[in-house]
Amino acid sequence: MRLISWNVNGLRACLNKGFLAFCALADADVICLQETKMRPEQAQFELEGYHRFWNSADKAGYSGTAVFTRREPLAVTYDFGEDIHRHEGRVITAEYEDFFLVCCYTPNSKDQLARLDYRMAWEDDLREYLLELDAKKPVVYCGDLNVAHQEIDLKNPQSNRMNPGFSDEERDKMTQLLSSGFVDTFRALYPKRTGAYSWWSCRFHARENNAGWRIDYFIVSARLMPRVKNADIWPEITGSDHCPVVLELTE
C-alpha cells in the first residue's frame, strides 16, 4: 500500500505544473494534500478511481487539506478538538479497517514566533487526539508538520535556531509526540541520511543548492512499524516549494 503526502502550495497552481501526470505515475493508494487553497466546487478535474475528501478553511484561498483514496474509508471526519481548531481546514481523518489516517497541515508559528502560543496549544491538543485514536487502532499521521525535528533535518541549523519551524519549543513538542508511542518512519529507517529535505525557500536558489528543511512526515504508531516497507522523499518532483513524501506499507 503506497501513501503519499504533499504540500502543493495551492492545488490550482499545481494542476498547471503536472499534478495529474504525477498522480498517474505515482500509482498511490492514498494521496494526502496540504495547503490546497481551494474549495471542492473549484476542483474542475478528474482523478479516476479515487474517492475525494476536502477540508477547506473559512478564509478563501488559505490553508486547506484533501485526501484522495482508492479504498473507501469506513468513516471520514474533519478537524478535531475545540472550536479554535476548526476554522482553517487543517485536518482530515479517514478510518480504515486496520488503521486511522490523519492528514494534517500544522499551523506555522509565523515570523518572530508570533503564533507560537497557539501552535503550542495545537500540538498538545493534537497529540491528545492522536493518542485517543491510537487507543482504538494504529495511526498513520502525515502532512506538513512545520517543524524540523533535529539538526540533521535542515541544511543550516545554527542560523535557524529560533526561527519558526526550528524553535526549541516546536522541536520539544515533536519529541513529546515521538516519546508517546509514535515513530518518524523516515528517520527510523535512515537515521544518518543527510541532505534529505522536503521544503525549500523560494529565495536564494535554495532548491538548486539543496538548502532545505525536512518538515513533511509520515509518523506511525510504533506497533505499525513492522508493516513499514519504506519511507522516502521525492525531491525530483516539482510543482510546489515542497516535494512529496511517501510511505509504503505491507497489506
Which residues make up each language-model segment?
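N-terminal, active-site-proximal structural segment of metallo-dependent hydrolase catalytic domains
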Residues: 1-47, 57-63, 78
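Active-site-proximal beta-strand elements of phosphoester/diester hydrolases
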Residues: 1-9, 98-110, 142
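Active-site beta-strand/loop signature of hydrolases that rely on acidic residues for catalysis
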Residues: 7, 23-41, 101, 130-151, ...
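Conserved beta strand-loop-helix elements of the APE1-like EEP
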Residues: 60-75, 203-226
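Active-site beta-strand termini and strand-to-loop segments that position acidic
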Residues: 70, 94-97, 221-222, 247-251
